[in-house]
Amino acid sequence: AVQGNHPSKLNPLTDTSVFLANEIQNKQYKIFYYDPKDLSVVNSKVVAEGFFIKFSYSNKKFYKIIKKQNLDLSKCKFILIRQDPPFNLEYISTTYILDTIKTKVKIINNPTSVRNISEKLYSSKYQKYMPATIFSQNMDEIKKFFKKNKKVILKPIHSFSGNDIHLLTKFNPKLVNKFIKKHDHIMCQKFLPKISNGDKRVFIINGKVCGAISRVPKKGSILSNMSKGAKPTNIKLTSKEIKISKIIAKDLKKENIFFAGIDFIDQKLNGDINVTSPTGLKTLYDLSGINLAKTFWKELKA
């Protein structure tokens, strides 16, 4: 089963959920798809109202709903948690619900681990590999940090896809205050001008570093997210990036995280450890012919 945003909201040309589902469908598995809002606990059973679906890259419409159904999810072999953040209370509630069946069904990523690993805050243990970074909502701390670093990126801790990211080149208490009011604790990071050359997204599957792509921001932008117009390219990782990636991959495996994406800018970890719904596998396949969806399911012994 796939727990995710409705297929009509997905772009099959880049979407990793579709890519993973299509691959397992080729192995004769049936795909059941549901929205997190349709997840319930009824008579002590975890059920979802959703539909069986078929994906096809060759058809004009890339999916076909076969049959709507209310399904007992404990009968599934695998469940992929694939809805986009924000990581809010609704997201957290779905992890608690799925926790109750995780001994019966293989859930990727493990719902307890998804809940425990804050995608930004988890990186605080890797700060020696990162540009100068603080997590705070204290105005004095943020001001001090800005004075020291001159150009600072402000990021919400629980958002995604480059949403609400600000580059601060002049300290603006009004703007910072507004940002804190909206997001509570925020991530402040020394700006790395080499972002204009692109970042690197590294894919980790079952504790192994499996591949990477680069994403180059469009002219005049600092955002390397493809959803914000960044252009993906093929890339090789440096030995330094591989070393850091392996350390994180080993830690994530211990934390029961099967699939993750981590990002580098200028050989520095940018602090996003993506464990909710990492993306980029379809793009890697289109650029290089490397099919990590095959690796993903092979590692799960599907």
Give, region by region, the residue ranges found by the protein language model.
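Short glycine-rich anion-binding loops that position phosphate/pyrophosphate groups of nucleotides
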Residues: 5-6, 83-86, 157-159, 278
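Redox-cofactor binding/interface segments in oxidoreductases and associated redox assembly factors
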Residues: 2, 80-81, 189
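Conserved N-proximal alpha/beta basic substrate-recognition cap immediately N-terminal to
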Residues: 8-135, 141
